[in-house]
């Protein structure tokens, strides 16, 4: 009963308080409820607040979120209560991000998506992570259409012949013909393994298909669902005159109106509205990522086929939302192998990986260098190449308190297991790219050593990549940063340059630091540019697998004058 009461209060509150662009309805008007998800990244099971594994301590504290079971509960409830007025759309990137997908790939993705049963989905770039051969079984196995209008699959016949891959579909919603068109960023050819698939620019493909749907299929309105990011969605809204509503993904953008419901800071209001040159207003929605929210967007269409009003907000899928038993039962046959995944050897190290308290909280440590370099690498390989920049984020700032254990591979012929890595990084935090002014970065570095002493190690002491820092902890607090050099990103050859207070830097950090953890409150109001596809432990795991055997060193990234001197004992 509590759930149903909360549910009705939630929907009533949305309807009452969040009406943002209503207009007087004319005769013949109707309503459509659009439910939407994007960038779920294999969060089939519930997660913690940072969208990684929900640990036992999180369950005890009722701090588990999302998962397909909670999405399913809400979708089923909306469909039961609202019937044919509901249109459930998914904007891609179901693949990649957890051991569930690593182990079971398209098999589990197909089964889980068929339980959710969206009316339609677009492809995401990560759907190509296992190549065309890893995507086609998914396209043939799902029981709903996958819409992507801007693909040229003529050189990949298995894609051309895929059962459920289409450019668009007509749906009857609230008794009216609604055209839905899908799209995918052409950057996918740089981000994943697309084989011989080619791409048409989104705007061109959408305009062509929208004209066809209007002329040949008698579509009354046009909704596009796709995976190109908020910046491109704004362009689509501006340059596609027949498009009425955009459901987006790819940029992992949290849009929200009002006070944030959890740790995610809204990038903009929900929906973002673009006004075309004709005066037509086009709303854009997106629902963050990782199944933590379900997008809810209710629109009013008048008798002329114009969007005249809307209301809605992403719904936080927290512990108050029950988990659908159908999903939980389906997951059980996969669970044991996933739980045993910790025993798997993920790589080899030729050196001790020092994550000890007396090393990483007083000095640069090689475990810190491994972790931060892995974050930089993960961002590089997920970012399109540029003629001017080798990456969009060359700097990582990571709190040493997040490093909880060393790994001594001498005990197992150099082998590193997933369980050992879990012990090093037990918190399961998301990774963000955050736009940080130079003066704020300097302030953060001052904070990182404001409590430094030779007797107590504090968690805020930094581990870094892309920085060379010189501290003097004998100086007064607030004046301990003596010099900082930053590895350039917008350059053809990386080199270290002095930190400039008035310059803005893209910095990779975890969700704990972004939320102000360990006293880093200066980062809380800053905007998140994007969320990396994998969490902290999955990112480091992938890096070790790719680069092994590894042998990270202490390289002089951090110099601490007046600090605790290293001893050989710290390495054992």
Curated annotation (Swiss-Prot):
Site (Transition state stabilizer): 126, 129
PROSITE patterns, sorted: 5_NUCLEOTIDASE_1, 5_NUCLEOTIDASE_2
Binding site for substrate: 361, 399, 404, 427, 512-518
Cofactor names: Zn(2+)
Class of the enzyme per the UniProt entry, highest EC level: hydrolase
Family: Belongs to the 5'-nucleotidase family.
Name under which the protein is recorded: Protein 5NUC
Organism listed in the record: Lutzomyia longipalpis
């Amino acid at each position: 009963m509590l759930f149903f009461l909360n549910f009705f209060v939630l929907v009533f509150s949305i309807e009452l308080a969040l009406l943002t662009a209503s207009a007087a309805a004319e005769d013949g008007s109707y309503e459509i409820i659009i439910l939407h998800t994007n960038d779920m990244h294999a969060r089939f099971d519930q997660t913690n607040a940072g969208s990684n594994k929900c640990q036992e301590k999180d369950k005890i504290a009722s701090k588990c979120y999302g998962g397909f079971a909670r999405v399913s509960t809400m979708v089923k409830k909306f469909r039961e209560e609202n019937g044919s007025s509901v249109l459930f759309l998914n904007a891609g990137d179901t693949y990649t991000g957890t051991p569930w997908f690593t182990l079971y790939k398209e098999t589990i993705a197909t089964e889980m998506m068929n339980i959710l049963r969206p009316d339609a989905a677009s492809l995401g770039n990560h759907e190509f992570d296992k190549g065309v051969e890893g995507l086609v079984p998914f396209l043939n196995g799902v029981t709903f259409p996958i819409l992507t209008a801007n693909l040229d699959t003529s050189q990949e016949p298995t894609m051309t012949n895929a059962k459920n891959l289409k450019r668009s579909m007509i749906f009857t919603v609230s008794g009216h013909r609604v055209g839905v068109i899908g799209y995918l960023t052409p950057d996918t050819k740089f981000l994943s393994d697309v084989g011989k698939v080619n791409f048409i620019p989104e705007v061109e493909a959408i305009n062509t298909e929208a004209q066809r749907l209007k002329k040949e299929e008698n579509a009354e309105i046009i909704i596009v669902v796709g995976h190109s990011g908020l910046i491109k969605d704004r362009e689509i809204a501006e340059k596609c005159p027949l498009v009425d509503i955009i459901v987006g993904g790819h940029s992992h953008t949290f849009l929200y109106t009002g006070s944030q419901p959890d740790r995610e800071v809204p990038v903009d209001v929900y929906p973002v509205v673009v006004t075309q040159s004709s005066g037509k207003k086009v709303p854009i929605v997106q629902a963050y990522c990782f199944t933590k929210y379900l997008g809810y967007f209710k629109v009013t269409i008048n008798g002329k086929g114009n969007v005249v009003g809307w209301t809605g907000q992403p719904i936080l899928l927290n512990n108050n939302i029950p988990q659908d038993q159908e999903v939980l039962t389906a997951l059980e046959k996969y669970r044991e192998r996933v739980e045993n995944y910790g025993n798997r050897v993920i790589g080899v190290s030729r050196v001790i990986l020092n994550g000890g308290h007396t090393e990483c909280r007083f000095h640069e440590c090689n475990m810190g260098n491994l972790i931060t370099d892995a974050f930089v690498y993960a961002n590089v390989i997920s970012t399109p190449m540029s003629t001017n920049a080798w990456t969009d984020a060359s700097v990582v700032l990571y709190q040493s308190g997040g490093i909880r254990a060393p790994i001594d591979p001498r005990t197992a012929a150099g082998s590193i297991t997933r369980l050992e890595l879990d012990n090093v990084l037990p918190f399961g935090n998301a990774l963000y790219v955050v736009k940080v002014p130079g003066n704020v970065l300097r302030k953060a570095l001052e904070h990182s050593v404001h409590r430094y002493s030779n007797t107590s190690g504090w968690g805020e002491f930094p581990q870094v990549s892309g920085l060379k820092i010189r501290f003097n902890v004998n100086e007064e607090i607030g004046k301990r940063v003596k010099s900082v050099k930053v590895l350039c990103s917008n350059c053809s050859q990386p080199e270290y340059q002095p930190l400039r207070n008035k310059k803005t830097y893209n910095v990779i950090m975890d969700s704990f630091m972004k939320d102000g953890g360990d006293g880093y409150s200066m980062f809380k109001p800053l905007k998140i540019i994007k969320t990396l596809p994998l969490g902290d432990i999955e990112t480091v795991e992938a890096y070790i697998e790719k680069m092994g055997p590894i042998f990270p060193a202490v390289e002089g990234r951090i110099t601490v004058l007046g600090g605790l001197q290293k001893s050989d004992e710290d390495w054992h």
